[in-house]
Regions:
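Active-site loop/lid in soluble adenylation, ligation, and acyl-transfer enzymes
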Residues: 4-137
Length: 137
């Protein structure tokens, strides 16, 4: 099938996948497929945890690790004999999935509410509180 023929298929035809076909796809594509078919946004700052099935986070981490290994190879870094880069792709993938974008892949925590016994009508700040975020730029 030519690229133009593929591009001209309807959205429904491009989106329909059998369970068998889905099972053979990388975790990122399965998750993206669920988001697209549910017509849900998946921008950089969106929480997509509802579309990540059990076990897929580990698969996603392995997929990211493989891509990062490719990046290191493209940068002409000897990751096999340079002890400084041993398992770098694995560590960086873990950092992105479990730390930098943690709020993306795990459900948001419940918000705790307290009664306003003092009837305050101003913002109360307790700190200092350090906040770190990944900018989508």
């Amino acid at each position: 099938m030519s690229q133009q023929t593929t591009d001209n298929r309807t959205t429904a035809e491009r989106l329909f996948r059998s369970e068998e076909e889905l099972a053979g796809m990388p975790a990122s594509e399965r998750i993206r497929y669920r988001l697209v078919t549910a017509n849900k946004r998946y921008h950089a700052n969106d929480n997509i945890s509802a579309f990540v099935h059990e076990g897929e986070l580990a698969e996603l981490k392995a997929e990211v690790q493989a891509k990062l290994q490719d990046v290191l190879q493209a940068l002409v870094i000897d990751t096999h004999s340079d002890h400084n880069t041993n398992e770098t792709a694995k560590r960086v993938a873990k950092m992105y999935i479990e730390e930098v974008f943690r709020g993306r892949y795990v459900p948001m925590p419940a918000v705790t509410e307290f009664p306003n016994a003092e009837r305050l009508n101003e913002l109360m700040i307790v700190g200092p509180i350090t906040i770190r975020s990944a900018c989508s730029h």
